[in-house]
């Protein structure tokens, strides 16, 4: 297990959850989501979305991956991967509120020297113009 990086995956949906399981093969991973029901299922070894192959969740948990809905639990991380959906409105404009909210959460636990990676479908400039100032 590589102990140089402790990875926090923010958002355990169809992108973040498989990503967390994959990184858990080599790194310490803490998954964070605001959906407490989802957290309980994952920590119990249940993938109700069928996003990962059979055995992948069990392997990730066995390697020490933990998931939480408590923001303070991700403070020990030094790499944060924000995998939040970006829905669009009726006019196909991106709704950035979930991304802004996730950025605010990460900003509360971010330390000097930490890394933040955004894995969301957004238009060019959003990370620099919207997310970075929030962090």
Predicted regions and their residues:
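A structured beta-alpha segment of the ubiquitous adenosine-cofactor-binding alpha/beta core
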Residues: 54-78, 88, 107
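Short conserved AdoMet
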Residues: 24, 75, 110-111
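N-terminal FAD cofactor-binding segment of flavoenzymes
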Residues: 50
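Rossmann-like NAD(P)(H) cofactor-binding subdomain of soluble oxidoreductases
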Residues: 88-135
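Conserved hydrophobic residues forming the short capping helix/wall of the S-adenosyl-L-methionine
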Residues: 46, 57, 131-135
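NAD(P)+-binding Rossmann beta1-loop-alpha1 motif at the extreme N-terminus of oxidoreductases
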Residues: 1-46
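Redox-cofactor binding/interface segments in oxidoreductases and associated redox assembly factors
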Residues: 80-82, 118
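A general structural motif
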Residues: 4, 77, 112-113
